[in-house]
Amino acid sequence: MNLSRNKARKVKQKRLRAKSELSRAASKPRLSVFKSHANFYAQLIDDQKRVTLASVSSLKSGKYGGNVAAAKELGLLMGQKILDLKLETVAFDRNGYLYHGRVKAFADAVREKGVKF
């Protein structure tokens, strides 16, 4: 029990540390990802104004669920939404997740659309 509490505490600290580093680069909007076992979510957040500029989720599309194919499709959708907002660069917030699997597929798909991190 104590081991899982320590692990959860370390993950939370890691996320907060990454978020504080990203908020220093406040000139760019933050592209934040969240993954559950069943779905994948992403938001484009303007930390200065504290508003969400765009969002996508596999829950809304309902095609694939939370697998790598869904993450790639959502990445293409988010890349198009970012370009529609006339933004070229964003700060990518992995939210403490490893850059692997669904997170990597999402990021690569956003980059395919021409958005720079």
Curated annotation (Swiss-Prot):
Is RNA-binding included in the keywords of this UniProt record? yes
One GO biological process term is:
translation
Q: Where is this region: Disordered?
A: 1-23
| Keyword Transmembrane part of the UniProt annotation | no
Provide this UniProt record's keywords sorted from A to Z.
Answer: Ribonucleoprotein, Ribosomal protein, RNA-binding, rRNA-binding
Any Pfam family: Ribosomal_L18p
Q: Which GO terms of the cellular component aspect does the record hold?
A: cytosolic large ribosomal subunit
Q: Which family is this protein grouped under?
A: Belongs to the universal ribosomal protein uL18 family.
Q: What name is this protein filed under?
A: Large ribosomal subunit protein uL18
